């Protein structure tokens, strides 16, 4: 049994510094690097790619909506053409830094609202998947398990990775509980670990209404901007190793 452990990183920009990237990155197998639209900038991207290479961590693009103020977590009325173009633009930016450090982009995981839009809207998911395929058909598209991001990526011929979340609660249909709700984020370490083991070992999660939902767990996400990110990542890694589960990049 194997699983990938990923984290959204490189999300500082300008004079705004947060997250424990230097402490987290040695503990994970895949880093999703912000590409400048929702967070990150040229200096942070360069440093994050360099850091990932130093720790043999797979580098992935983490493109988001153009919304620094809202951290890319607010829905924006945006056309399919704009979505396609912003995907290509951000992938190109990350590829530049990967090239100078002789690292290959391994995967793509949309951020925040763009991720949720693609998970719930088949047409948007198709646009995202097509952009990734057109940029590089060998890339892995990471998306919410059982969502349109996964099905549409498969339709265009991409390799996919179904993602589950250690620090988020689930609806009965397998979607994530909206961050607008007070109970959307898991902050208790024991609860997060229990959820992770159930998802990885049984391919199931218990929804907020106590319903058992089936899902595929190829990669586990911990949000790098979360208050308990470092603790969660270290404890998840520890318990997976204790259970004999291999932690490998996608």
UniProtKB/Swiss-Prot annotation:
GO biological process: carbohydrate metabolic process
Described purpose of this protein according to its UniProt entry: Catalyzes the cleavage of 5-oxoproline to form L-glutamate coupled to the hydrolysis of ATP to ADP and inorganic phosphate.
Catalytically driven reaction(s): 5-oxo-L-proline + ATP + 2 H2O = L-glutamate + ADP + phosphate + H(+)
Taxonomic source organism: Staphylococcus aureus (strain MRSA252)
Description of how the protein assembles with itself and partners: Forms a complex composed of PxpA, PxpB and PxpC.
Example GO molecular function: ATP binding
Pfam families: LamB_YcsF
Enzyme category, top tier: hydrolase
Keywords: ATP-binding, Hydrolase, Nucleotide-binding
Top-rank lineage group of the source organism: Bacteria
EC number: 3.5.2.9
Keyword Hydrolase: yes
Protein's name in the database: 5-oxoprolinase subunit A
Stated family: Belongs to the LamB/PxpA family.
């Amino acid at each position: 049994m194997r699983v990938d452990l990923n984290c959204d990183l490189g999300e500082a920009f300008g004079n705004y510094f947060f997250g424990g990237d230097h402490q987290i990155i040695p503990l994970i197998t895949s880093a999703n690097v912000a590409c400048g639209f929702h967070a990150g900038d040229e200096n942070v991207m360069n440093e994050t790619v360099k850091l990932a290479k130093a720790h043999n961590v797979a580098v992935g693009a983490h493109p988001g909506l153009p919304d620094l103020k809202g951290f890319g977590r607010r829905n924006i009325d945006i056309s399919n053409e704009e979505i396609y173009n912003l995907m290509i633009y951000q992938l190109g930016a990350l590829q530049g830094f990967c090239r100078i450090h002789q690292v290959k982009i391994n995967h793509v995981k949309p951020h925040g609202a763009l991720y949720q839009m693609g998970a719930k809207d088949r047409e948007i998911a198709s646009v995202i998947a097509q952009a990734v395929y057109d940029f590089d058909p060998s890339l892995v598209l990471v998306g919410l398990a059982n969502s349109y991001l996964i099905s549409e990526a498969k339709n265009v011929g991409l390799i996919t990775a179904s993602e589950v979340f250690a620090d988020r609660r689930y609806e009965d249909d397998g979607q994530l509980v909206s961050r607008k709700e007070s109970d959307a984020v898991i902050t208790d370490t024991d609860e997060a670990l229990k959820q992770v083991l159930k998802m990885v070992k049984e391919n199931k999660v218990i929804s907020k209404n106590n319903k058992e939902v089936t899902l595929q767990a190829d990669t586990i996400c911990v949000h790098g901007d979360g208050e308990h990110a470092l603790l969660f990542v270290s404890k998840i890694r520890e318990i997976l190793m204790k259970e004999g589960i291999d932690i490998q990049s996608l």
